[in-house]
Amino acid sequence: MLSSSSSSTVEQPSRGGSPGINAVSSDVLRSNILTRLDGSSLAALSCTCSNLNSFCSDESLWRQQCSATWPSTSDTRVQSIISTFPDGHRTFFSDSFPFLEHDVGINLPPSVDTSELISAVDIFYKDDVIFSRVHVTETVSGWFLCSPMRVDLVEPKELIPTRVLVTDQCKDDTWKSDLEENLSLSWILIDPTCKRAADVSTRKPVSVHRHWLTGEVHVKFSSIFVVGNKKRSEQVEFTVTVVLAVFNRREEETAVMQIREVSLVAEDKDGRNLGGKVSLEILVAAMGMKRRFRAGGEEEGKEKYIEYMERKTAKAEMKWRRGKETAMETAACWIAVLLLGFLLCFYLFMHKNLVAIMKKLIK
């Protein structure tokens, strides 16, 4: 048998059993095996035994996983914040990679000490990065707390070129199915004060449509949270909108898409924008929620969005019907008042004339 005299040799197997993982060199395990795993596989492997847990806890492995999964996390500002997390990049990955549990009600905290939110945003097309940006939002000024919640990553006159090509986009909906299948987005919000993070995106689009006037393509990612307890709860929606402008090349059948807008807003069930204070409280509370590692989270997120929009549309239609009924009742009341007024005036006019005629006859 070979002895484990160096890190590049195979260790001696245990007595009466198979060599197992102990027969693999630690250098081989670190360099050739663990580095080839994705984050979820690495996390699952760390739960198998204490030896593997020790190897899988290597900070460099998780730093590599975070940078490969979200290129924006390589930013120096993000790196400095992640270094303050309890277990560094491993904690950050376990916070950001799973989906948030949206079915559990969020209880708003009495106060929030968060002074800023860091947005680490990456957009992928066919697994290639086409947009990566880090944005800092201060959360203590009166402007943020009292204004509607909105985070914009692209300047008004800025156009970011992409490698997304569209062919015959006006004749069929192939461009739509292509974007629904191949475009993905992660919007990780980081709280430096509480040392927590969460991805508020559904990763896959929940809606893709073309604006009827400008021709721009609006791609929507949405996360819906339940705020409050079962007896008194309300649904709120955090929406990420990506606007793609189509740039046609001369004498070519293909068109290039450019990113015109990447924004995050918060709305209630009636479509009203939430203020910064309430939105911040919801986001901070959501970062402390349970996470879901279940497969098919993108499809589930889209299904929840469709259900939410159906309820929202039904409520809007009911509200419109009630408004219409109220308007008709109000109109009927005014017509009745006008009719009664007309009849009263007619009665007074006739009464006055009859009195005058009677006086003449008496004379």
From Swiss-Prot:
PANTHER family, per the entry: F-BOX DOMAIN-CONTAINING PROTEIN, F-BOX PROTEIN-RELATED
Disulfide bridge positions per record: none
Annotated ranges, domain F-box: 27-66
Organism: Arabidopsis thaliana
Ranges for region Disordered: 1-23
InterPro entries: AT3G44326-like (IPR045283), F-box-like_dom_sf (IPR036047), F-box_dom (IPR001810)
GO cellular component entries: membrane; SCF ubiquitin ligase complex
Protein name per its UniProtKB record: F-box protein At3g44326
GO BP, sorted A to Z: regulation of steroid metabolic process
